Amino acid sequence: SAGKDKIYHHQLKVKADEIACVDENCLANGTFLKIENTPFDFKEFHEIGERINDDHEQLKLAGGYDHSFMVKDEDDQLVLYDKETGRKMTMTTTLPCIQVYTGNFLSGGCNRKGGKPYENRDGVALEAQFLPNSIHIEKEPKVILRKGEEYEAVTTYRFEVE
C-alpha cells in the first residue's frame, strides 16, 4: 500500500476458521482462537481498518494484526482488494498458515521512495509459512528438514485489476 490512507480501506478475505494466538513477544504460544464473530473473522470481505483497533487481547498484544491464519486446504485462500484502484491480489498456498501483518511497527524504520519515512500501518505483509515458533510448540514440527529429505511447498500470488 504505502499510500495516502495506510492500509485501512483495503478489503481482506481469508478462508480460515482459527488463528494462532500470540504472547507478549508476538510469538505463537501454542493456543488457537476460533475467529467467528471476532475482529479476526475475514471469511467475508472486511476492510482491514474496520476492527483493527477493537478491544481484543490479541490485537492489543500485537498492536494490530500480526497473526497466522490457519488456512483451509482450498484455492484462493486469501484475497486482498483495493476498491479505490481495483487492484486485487489472490493467494493460494500448500503451507498451513498465512501470516497477516499490518505493519504495526514500521515507524522509525526504512524510508519509502522519495525519502519519506514509513509510519505504522503503512503496509501489509501476507506471508505463507509454517506456524511460527512451531519448533517449540508442536510435538512433531514439520519445519525440520533432515539430511537427505526433500521439501516442497507451492505458493501462488495472482494479481488482477477489476
Where are these regions (language model features)?
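An exposed, glycine/acidic-rich loop-and-rim segment of catalytic or binding clefts
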Residues: 1-162
